[in-house]
């Protein structure tokens, strides 16, 4: 069972709460109206960043079930990294983590380098969104999925050495990467989704010969993009190369 939508919408004076029922999931948005919440005890990990809504909530006042483990500044549940509370320039994700949850590192502007263990399979939505000082990432060699907006607005990243195991890259995943210069799309990726590389204004070269579908606005606004290696049978969506130097939709 889930928490009914809007259940706590009028309970703004609550400062402490215990949610120990058999819930399928508990989302941060379920508790977003509890502005005065200072401590919470749950039977399951809270999905999302509750601190975004409950400014008075301290890290040491969130207690959860035995499924949760804390490794230094990392909070992990069932091999999913769900929270990071550090302020390091170099972040080494603990071994054993398979999933980096949504928005875990969003807006962490002190981070310059990320090192992932080879256990990581999935990077969630907005996981590294707006990490504006990030310049280097060592990816897991077994990574298969990159979520929507995962690296959007990482303005200092010049190149992503994506492993050949990647099968899926979400929409807007690398949008507004102003320093990005070259892209080599892994062979297992067949679709470039909506606005994946939109407004990467310094992007000059893209190799994506295995891609068979390019969705709308995928490279829109990449004003320096000229050299593109494409599959001969690729299907190109509207405005995919709008405001670029690509002449025709199948320029090689």
Predicted regions and their residues:
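Structural signature of tandem-repeat unit edges
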Residues: 1-2, 11-27, 34-49, 58-73, ...
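Consensus positions within tandem repeat domains that build extended binding/scaffold surfaces
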Residues: 4-7, 30, 102-104, 124-127, ...
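Conserved, function-critical positions that sit in or immediately flank catalytic
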Residues: 54
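Eukaryotic protein-protein interaction scaffolds centered on beta-propeller repeats
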Residues: 75, 79-83
């Amino acid at each position: 069972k889930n928490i009914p939508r809007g259940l706590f919408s009028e309970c703004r004076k609550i400062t402490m709460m215990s949610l120990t029922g058999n819930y399928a999931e508990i989302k941060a948005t379920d508790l977003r109206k509890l502005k005065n919440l200072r401590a919470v005890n749950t039977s399951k990990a809270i999905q999302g960043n509750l601190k975004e809504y409950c400014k008075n909530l301290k890290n040491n006042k969130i207690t959860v079930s035995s499924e949760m483990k804390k490794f230094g500044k990392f909070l992990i549940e069932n091999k999913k990294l769900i929270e990071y509370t550090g302020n390091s320039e170099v972040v080494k994700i603990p071994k054993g983590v398979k999933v980096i949850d949504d928005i875990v590192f969003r807006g962490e502007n002190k981070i310059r380098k990320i090192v992932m263990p080879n256990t990581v399979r999935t990077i969630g939505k907005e996981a590294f969104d707006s990490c504006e000082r990030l310049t280097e990432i060592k990816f897991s060699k077994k990574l298969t999925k990159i979520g929507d907006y995962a690296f959007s607005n990482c303005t200092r990243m010049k190149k992503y050495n994506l492993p050949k195991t990647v099968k899926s890259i979400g929409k807007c995943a690398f949008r507004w990467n102003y320093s990005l210069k070259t892209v080599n799309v892994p062979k297992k990726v067949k679709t470039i989704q909506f606005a994946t590389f939109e407004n990467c204004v310094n992007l000059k070269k893209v190799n994506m010969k295995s891609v068979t579908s390019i969705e709308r606005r995928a490279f829109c606004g990449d004003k320096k993009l000229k050299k593109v290696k494409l599959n001969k049978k690729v299907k190109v969506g509207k405005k995919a190369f709008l405001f670029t130097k690509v002449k025709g939709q199948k320029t090689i």
